[in-house]
């Protein structure tokens, strides 16, 4: 089953980043743009400066799970978002990451 909420193509990432609307905290930078759909679409980018491949994939899995578990809270946001992860994410626990990310996404509304 294809997940229609995920942004994967490079040109889609570039389009949203070039739109230049951002919101950030010490863990995440979120680029966002309005979309025509009635749901949130997201892409996750973790740079190579953050750990090795195992660590980067773990962070991406955690972010996907946070979004999946909290979709009822953030589902009304009809935006395309790109989540850029900063290195400070490695020092935080999952519960803290969840609170920070959900709070940031809610601010987009």
UniProtKB/Swiss-Prot annotation:
Record keywords, A-Z: Endonuclease, Hydrolase, Nuclease, RNA-binding, tRNA processing
Pfam families: Ribonuclease_P
Top-rank taxon: Bacteria
GO cellular component terms, A-Z: ribonuclease P complex
InterPro entries cross-referenced by the UniProt entry: Ribosomal_Su5_D2-typ_SF, Ribsml_uS5_D2-typ_fold_subgr, RNase_P, RNase_P_CS
EC number: 3.1.26.5
Catalytic reactions on record: Endonucleolytic cleavage of RNA, removing 5'-extranucleotides from tRNA precursor
Gene Ontology annotations of biological process type: tRNA 5'-leader removal
GO molecular function: 3'-tRNA processing endoribonuclease activity; ribonuclease P activity; tRNA binding
Homology family: Belongs to the RnpA family.
Protein function: RNaseP catalyzes the removal of the 5'-leader sequence from pre-tRNA to produce the mature 5'-terminus. It can also cleave other RNA substrates such as 4.5S RNA. The protein component plays an auxiliary but essential role in vivo by binding to the 5'-leader sequence and broadening the substrate specificity of the ribozyme.
Subunit description: Consists of a catalytic RNA component (M1 or rnpB) and a protein subunit.
Entry protein name: Ribonuclease P protein component
Organism per entry: Mycoplasma capricolum subsp. capricolum (strain California kid / ATCC 27343 / NCTC 10154)
């Amino acid at each position: 089953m294809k997940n229609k909420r995920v942004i994967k193509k490079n040109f889609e990432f570039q389009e949203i980043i070039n739109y230049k609307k951002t919101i950030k905290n010490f863990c995440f930078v979120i680029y966002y743009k309005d979309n025509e759909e009635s749901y949130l679409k997201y892409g996750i980018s973790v740079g190579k400066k953050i750990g090795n491949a195992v660590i980067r994939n773990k962070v991406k899995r955690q972010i996907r799970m946070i979004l999946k578990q909290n979709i009822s809270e953030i589902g009304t946001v009809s935006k395309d978002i790109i989540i850029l992860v900063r290195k400070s994410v490695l020092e935080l626990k999952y519960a803290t990451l969840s609170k920070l990310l959900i709070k940031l996404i809610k601010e987009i509304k």
